[in-house]
């Protein structure tokens, strides 16, 4: 079975083809980073227009890469939410139209389920049950996962997501958009301990997160200490350490609460090397396992949508002729497969 996956939820156009026997046959990605850089963030209208320009050509490239034709595709999966409504509508419209033209099923996919299942694309996929840390620019959540669609929300950010906090703090440090990876690179040159940031909401019970205060703390630290290169690096180090420690503390609590031995980390921030190293060390001490996707599958991509679409199709999920998207879509609302 071969599934074409279409991802257009934000500022990446991702197209992939997944075969349930041979694995990933094609993976095409176009990033709009340069388009939005001058604005310091994603401009929804520009994102939508660029998806219109890039989606069909990338589908053609994916078919060429895989050596397949339209007749070889058994289903078309597309991101139906959450995300930017205009961007979602581009992928949904193209996906639904192709499915109709090719006379194959159309499968709406939840963007965050795609991220959650991305580690399944690796050679050593996690087995159920596990705790999932979904950490990206728009989401920071801890999920108890006992099967496909069997998701229980354990905790989430009550304000900024971790990735959003990274980008906003990077902007305060004078870094270009998207600033998160640049901040991490700067943090590697920083001195540990010169500045100490709080670990938000770790002094009380519960699994929720709050990262907006760290941005304010960073702004005040920059104001009081100047912006020479070493000071900026030290502030970046303190900020990253605070976010990573907070995520690690909450993961420990989630594992203790569920009794699970496996931790899955997914979403754009899961590519952060410091976070990966700290969680790997933590799970080794707990005699557990940590799983994550390769870096190119941590950020938005079509491969995770194609894979999630295949899983959902096998569970009987298809869409009608209408095109609908959900900019807001709680993961817990998905049916069990």
Curated annotation (Swiss-Prot):
PANTHER family: TRNA N6-ADENOSINE THREONYLCARBAMOYLTRANSFERASE, TRNA N6-ADENOSINE THREONYLCARBAMOYLTRANSFERASE, MITOCHONDRIAL
Pfam family of the protein (one): TsaD
EC class: transferase
Binding positions (substrate): 134-138, 167, 180, 272
Entries under PROSITE patterns matching the protein: GLYCOPROTEASE (PS01016)
Location in or out of the cell: Cytoplasm
Gene: tsaD
Catalysed conversion reaction: L-threonylcarbamoyladenylate + adenosine(37) in tRNA = N(6)-L-threonylcarbamoyladenosine(37) in tRNA + AMP + H(+)
Species for this entry: Escherichia coli (strain SMS-3-5 / SECEC)
Key words of the record: Acyltransferase, Cytoplasm, Iron, Metal-binding, Transferase, tRNA processing
One GO CC term on file: cytoplasm
Name of the featured protein: tRNA N6-adenosine threonylcarbamoyltransferase
Binding positions for Fe cation per the UniProt entry: 111, 115, 300
Cofactor comment: Binds 1 Fe(2+) ion per subunit.
Record-linked InterPro entries: ATPase_NBD, Gcp-like_dom, KAE1/TsaD, Peptidase_M22_CS, TsaD
């Amino acid at each position: 079975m071969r599934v074409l996956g279409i991802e257009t939820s934000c500022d990446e156009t991702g197209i992939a083809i997944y075969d349930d026997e041979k694995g990933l046959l094609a993976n095409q990605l176009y990033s709009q980073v340069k388009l939005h850089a001058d604005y310091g963030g994603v401009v929804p209208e520009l994102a939508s227009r660029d998806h219109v320009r890039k989606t069909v050509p990338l589908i053609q490239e994916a078919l060429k890469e895989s050596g397949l034709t339209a007749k070889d595709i058994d289903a078309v999966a597309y991101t139906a939410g959450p995300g930017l409504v205009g961007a979602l509508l581009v992928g949904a419209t193209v996906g639904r139209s192709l499915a109709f033209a090719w006379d194959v099923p159309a499968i709406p996919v939840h963007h965050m389920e795609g991220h959650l299942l991305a580690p399944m694309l690796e050679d050593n996929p996690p087995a159920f049950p596990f705790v999932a840390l979904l950490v990206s620019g728009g989401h920071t959540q801890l999920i108890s996962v006992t099967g496909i669609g069997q998701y229980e929300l354990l905790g989430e950010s009550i304000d900024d997501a971790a990735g959003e906090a990274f980008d906003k703090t990077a902007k305060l440090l004078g870094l270009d958009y998207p600033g998160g990876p640049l901040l991490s690179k700067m943090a590697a040159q920083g001195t540990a301990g010169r500045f100490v940031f709080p670990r938000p909401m770790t002094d009380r019970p519960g699994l929720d997160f709050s990262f907006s205060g760290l941005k304010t703390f960073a702004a005040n630290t920059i104001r009081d200490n100047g912006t020479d290169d070493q000071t900026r690096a030290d502030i970046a180090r303190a900020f990253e350490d605070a976010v990573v420690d907070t995520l690690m503390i909450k993961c420990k609590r989630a594992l203790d609460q569920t009794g699970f031995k496996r931790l899955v980390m997914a979403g754009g921030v899961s590519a952060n090397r410091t976070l990966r190293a700290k969680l790997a060390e933590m799970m080794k001490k707990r005699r557990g396992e940590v799983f994550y996707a390769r870096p190119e599958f941590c950020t938005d991509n079509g491969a995770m949508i194609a894979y999630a679409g295949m899983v959902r199709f096998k569970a009987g999920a298809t869409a009608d002729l209408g095109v609908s998207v959900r900019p807001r879509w709680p993961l817990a609302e998905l049916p069990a497969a």
